[in-house]
Amino acid sequence: EDGRAEALVPEDRRAWHAGAGSWQGRDDVNSRSIGIEIANPGDRPFPVTQMDAVVTLLRDIMARWQISPHGVIGHSDMAPGRKIDPGPRFDWQRLVHEGLALQGGQGPDLPLDASLTRIGYPPADPETRLAAFRLRFRPWGQGAESPADRCCAAFVAASVTRLTAAAGRAYQA
């Protein structure tokens, strides 16, 4: 939590950090990703020094490996119902403002399931997928699926479409 970063596994090696899950229809996330483990129990804000280190590390990794903001996900995104980290207290907005992650927002009221699939969430029961989406994009959301959930998910899905088109190719993990 003091901002120190340690490389436990070289970036070009498989780290076995993510476990079972998928993103954008692709299984075996461990073989397609670089894991950043962040020390925080999840029930308190992440210290500024820790977030500064995350931003610096992400910026370097994204430049080295040509990773788009859509490629920056949490364990809860790729393993809904099984993983909950980095949790609702993680400062995703800081990453958004730094251009390192996608932002939720307002969009058309489209079916939630279609938007979550386009974003990359793996198949799971609707409540589990909604909970995983909310952990990342609407941590204050509660109860049954709402129009705000659908609008936010549609906005993120549209961002994914724009980023994919701008890159001229499908997202490659």
Model-predicted segments: where are they?
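Cell-envelope/ECM-targeting effectors and their regulatory/trafficking segments
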Residues: E11, G19-S22, M51-Q66, P80-A173
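Acidic helix-start/capping segments at beta-turn-to-alpha-helix junctions
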Residues: V72-R82
